[in-house]
Amino acid sequence: MDIPISSRDFRGLQLACVALGLVAGSIIIGISVSKAAAAMGGVFIGAAVLGLLILAYPFLKARFNLDHILPTIGSLRIHPHPGADHGEGRSSTNGNKEGARSSLSTVSRTLEKLKPGTRGAEEC
């Protein structure tokens, strides 16, 4: 049984649900004694904020042209820069390579000890 509802009524219901979630979450947090109850109030507030974002998305999309912004945000990549030389007398890239080799040799020695049938495995 489908009941027709106008877009204006639908937005009103969404806004009422958001307001109810905010009020309920605030009351639960305000009267809570335990941390678990306060967390439940936080869940109510989080759900209300999500509902508010869903409600406001069409307006934000039209106002800020999110179709243009969102692909740009999605293609952002973080490219870390090598750290500054700390006066050790060698470049940071060589230090990283030597550190990686040292770690690799440590892992290799540990794996050799764990192999069945080798002397290192019998000592453990």
Curated annotation (Swiss-Prot):
The chain crosses the membrane at residues 13-33, 40-60. Its main location: membrane. Residues 110-124 have a biased composition (Basic and acidic residues). Residues 90-109 have a biased composition (Polar residues). Residues 80-124 are annotated as: Disordered. Pfam families: Kinocilin. GO terms for cellular component: apical plasma membrane; ciliary basal body; cuticular plate; kinocilium; neuronal cell body. It is found in: Membrane. It is a multi-pass membrane protein. Keywords: Membrane, Transmembrane, Transmembrane helix. May play a role in stabilizing dense microtubular networks or in vesicular trafficking. This is Kinocilin. It comes from Homo sapiens. The lineage of its organism: Eukaryota, Metazoa, Chordata, Craniata, Vertebrata.
